[in-house]
């Protein structure tokens, strides 16, 4: 089994240990230079995806950011510059996080009030979670036509895109227009203009509040199960976090799964977790051993560098996962749902599922970001995460930086959002009952 630490695992560690208060302007010029230089150095030796950004001159970028970090007015602004610096690497598992106290004071999101997504070239409200917004008439399917009196696309490019970490264009789009679009300083509500279905525009002021996804992953429900059409089970896996609890939860659900005639597994909006959990679940659906992905990581051998050699790689061997021998294996048809919000360990789950040849994937291309981040402590109790590993299918095909293609592509339309339809699930039911 792969000894793999996914990004959300590291973030849970980060946010559980970095929680004390500190002076918000504590970093000296020496600290700021050191932090920037530490990132530059560790990335130079350990980052696994320079081959996917051949036009980036990392040394030149480092030089460009020296005056920028020195001119930062406080610790928060300094970390914003570091985030911009790291975003140049275009990798979803390579990023910078501030100390939690600063993040909670300065950074907030409206994700608990409403959710958004870019659909058919428009910024569409997909969920309305706040009662006061519902009372005022906001509904899923409506379009956001302005943010802080700006075109939403111009606003996103100026205030959101520079801080986004993404390995693929579709993951970048999701992070800009879904996960971070209305985020910003906690003390500053975001003003949006929303066009209803009759063309009328209503203005709203949306408050922001501190929110840490990783904390919610620990406290939220990782698994959901119900039976849909014609005794078809539907298993929603929200994350692969919480080793012992999620195993016991799955074991309880598995007794119900065994009673179904077919199964749909949904890993949409799954941000990842622990590989041993994802493979624990998959082993219940495997009646023979299956291979898991290969990986490689950059190596630095000083003598070889002195002889002028190019980058060298440590490459893993093949790994094979054996099915359970002491449990009843589920052998009935399975369909897997995935999309651009299927990230990290959830993508490895998809890759293993395809390798097992247990069924089709329905939905859209996955995020295209997985790997093993190195954690680097920074001045001011921040943390840099640097992806050190490239993952592949067992046959050598890449999916990091590309995403995993579905067998059947289905994407929700604006009309689907308005009607509260799930065309991906509907297509899966149709496929599995054929």
Segment roles from a protein language model:
Residues 9, 14, 28, 34, ...:
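Generic detection of intrinsically disordered/low-complexity segments and helix-coil linkers/edges
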Residues 21-263, 267-296, 370, 374-377, ...:
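Flexible, low-complexity junctional segments that flank or bridge functional domains
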Residues 8, 19-21, 61, 345, ...:
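Generic recognition of cysteine residues
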Residues 1-24:
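Bacterial Sec-dependent N-terminal signal peptides
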Residues 274-421, 426, 431:
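Conserved acidic, small-residue-rich alpha-beta core segments centered on
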